[in-house]
Regions:
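N-terminal Rossmann-like NAD(P) cofactor-binding subdomain of oxidoreductases
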Residues: 1-299
Length: 299
């Protein structure tokens, strides 16, 4: 009993130490640390320990005893940033190779040197704020880091009734499937905005794309994600490109016509720089295509 309790307390202590280092790397260098794909950012002690236990389904025996030294060595590496680092995979590789852990980690992340200053941000506008829009908002906000990468700057909706802003904020806070929002949300009625985890998200009320000048809100070179499904062809979605401040458009539904339907991990390399409008395909397509690709590649 004493042995098991002592082991548990030791792992709790290591997880507590990890929280500080994880936060430091995330805030100062925009590094998202994970364990076999599961992010450790903003996680509790128990959640960190559980993330390690879940590796058993991949026949990997891993604990914070193995990953904490990797994280500690990672924190010592200078001039890196804007990346996801899988502590679990590095820990397994280190167990096989051995040697000086600081040298091993420094060599493993060598390709990330200089990243801290090279990743520019991209303004994002959600055109529509239904279920898909709100889930997208959660994902973008959770990865907003220090303002590099995707920055959710605005949502465009039709004004429904009095108290519209508070209602939309409430729907973002709570989801019947995905649970409560991870963080804090407040409403700025005067400036018609939602503040989520420190991100100022302007709520623009408009009935059509033609009504919006995004540059008036400090939004430039933006990616508009149309999640309304109202327009599904290139001609209809091209309305967004005519708005000042918009550079590209993504549709969150299967497209019509010749527009590319893209599933990341399957055909994302088909996207060309001249493609200003693409479709992210349907939820069914995204769910089944990666599995079909694996089967097709294998058999």
């Amino acid at each position: 009993h004493a042995e098991h309790q002592g082991r548990w307390k030791n792992r709790e202590e290591l997880a507590e130490r990890m929280i500080s280092l994880l936060g430091q790397l995330y805030r100062e260098k925009n590094i998202v640390a994970s364990v076999y794909g599961r992010s450790l950012i903003n996680r509790s002690v128990i959640q960190i320990l559980k993330a390690h236990r879940r590796t058993r389904v991949m026949d990997v025996e891993l604990s914070v005893v193995h990953t904490y030294p990797i994280l500690e060595a990672l924190a010592k590496v200078e001039n890196i940033g804007s990346a996801e680092v899988d502590l679990g995979k590095l820990a397994v590789e280190y167990k096989e190779k051995g040697g000086d852990i600081n040298a091993f980690v420094a060599d493993a992340v060598q390709s990330l040197e200089g990243n801290a200053k090279t990743v520019a941000h991209r303004d994002v506008v959600l055109y529509g704020f239904g279920r898909i829009g709100r889930i997208l908002a959660r994902l973008i906000i959770s990865q907003s880091g220090l303002g590099r990468g995707l920055n959710l700057k605005a949502i465009v909706v039709r004004k429904s009734s009095d108290g519209d802003l508070e209602k939309r904020a409430s729907l973002l806070r709570r989801d019947s499937i995905h649970g409560p929002f991870s963080g804090t949300i407040s409403v700025d009625e005067e400036n018609e905005a939602i503040i989520a985890n420190g991100n100022f998200i302007k709520v623009i009320y408009a009935s059509s794309p033609a009504e919006v000048d995004y540059t008036a809100y400090g939004i430039n070179n933006a990616l508009v994600i149309d999640n309304t499904g109202k327009w599904r062809d290139a001609e209809g979605l091209a309305q967004h490109l005519k708005c000042p401040g918009v550079a590209r458009v993504v549709l969150t539904a299967p497209s019509k016509g010749e527009m590319k339907n893209v599933v990341y991990g399957v055909n994302h390399t088909d996207i060309l720089d001249e493609d200003k409008i693409i479709s992210a395909a349907s939820c069914t397509t995204n769910a089944i295509t990666p599995v079909l690709k694996v089967l097709d590649d294998k058999y």
